[in-house]
Curated annotation (Swiss-Prot):
Species the sequence originates in: Wolinella succinogenes (strain ATCC 29543 / DSM 1740 / CCUG 13145 / JCM 31913 / LMG 7466 / NCTC 11488 / FDC 602W) (Vibrio succinogenes)
Any single GO CC term annotated in Swiss-Prot or TrEMBL for this entry: plasma membrane
Name the record gives this protein: ATP synthase subunit delta
Superkingdom classification of source: Bacteria
InterPro entries referenced in this protein's UniProt entry, alphabetically: ATP_synth_OSCP/delta_N_sf, ATPase_OSCP/dsu
Compartments (UniProt record): Cell inner membrane
Quaternary data: F-type ATPases have 2 components, F(1) - the catalytic core - and F(0) - the membrane proton channel. F(1) has five subunits: alpha(3), beta(3), gamma(1), delta(1), epsilon(1). F(0) has three main subunits: a(1), b(2) and c(10-14). The alpha and beta chains form an alternating ring which encloses part of the gamma chain. F(1) is attached to F(0) by a central stalk formed by the gamma and epsilon chains, while a peripheral stalk is formed by the delta and b chains.
Cystines in this chain: none
Free-text function comment from the UniProt entry: F(1)F(0) ATP synthase produces ATP from ADP in the presence of a proton or sodium gradient. F-type ATPases consist of two structural domains, F(1) containing the extramembraneous catalytic core and F(0) containing the membrane proton channel, linked together by a central stalk and a peripheral stalk. During catalysis, ATP synthesis in the catalytic domain of F(1) is coupled via a rotary mechanism of the central stalk subunits to proton translocation.
Entry similarity comment: Belongs to the ATPase delta chain family.
Length: 176
């Protein structure tokens, strides 16, 4: 749910500021990351005893000087009691910047670690197929198979040993 709301705010920022100023906006918003990482700051944002205006002012103090549209953005978030969405808005802005640059993250899930040469070959082949720049990261799990996901493009490719065996059994049973 938070992601959907953050996506709307990020989209509004992109429309208000334009694609060319996204990087500087993201940098400005990321100035609050350390504060959002503290429990005391989170408690202050969640506290019903502190006014929305004061919460907004505290966040603005953490962020420092910014242009009028960004200051108004923070005031709107404070007014709607959604200041805790700032880290999520940052993630959505990062995705938007990556999409304009045609850069995406792919996650390869396997049981065993692949060597760098194999990972690079997979990355290059997939990048060529998708006509995009990819950064491939590997994730190890207890999973008998291979799964490759590029979430932002909606691409998922998997091969599971268990599914292969089940499909083979069904095929043999249908043959008789």
């Amino acid at each position: 749910m938070r992601e959907l709301v953050a996506k709307r705010y990020a989209k509004a920022l992109v429309e208000a500021l334009g694609e060319d100023r996204l990087a500087s906006t993201l940098e400005w918003l990321k100035g609050s990351e350390s504060a959002f990482g503290t429990e005391a700051f989170q408690e202050m944002l969640a506290s019903p005893q502190i006014s929305k205006t004061l919460k907004g002012q505290v966040v603005l103090d953490v962020l420092g000087d910014g242009e009028a549209k960004l200051l108004n953005f923070i005031k709107v978030l404070a007014d709607k009691n959604r200041l805790e969405l700032i880290p999520d808005v940052c993630k959505e802005l990062e995705k938007s910047i990556a999409a304009t640059r045609n850069e995406y993250v792919a996650v390869l899930t396997t049981q065993e670690a692949f060597d760098d040469k194999t990972l690079k070959a997979i990355e290059e082949t997939l990048a060529k197929k998708l006509q995009a720049k990819l950064v491939l990261s590997q994730k190890r799990e207890e999973f008998e198979g291979v799964k490759l996901v590029v979430e932002d493009l909606g691409v998922e490719v998997s091969f599971s040993r268990e599914r292969f065996i089940n499909d083979l059994k069904n095929h043999i049973l249908k043959a008789f």
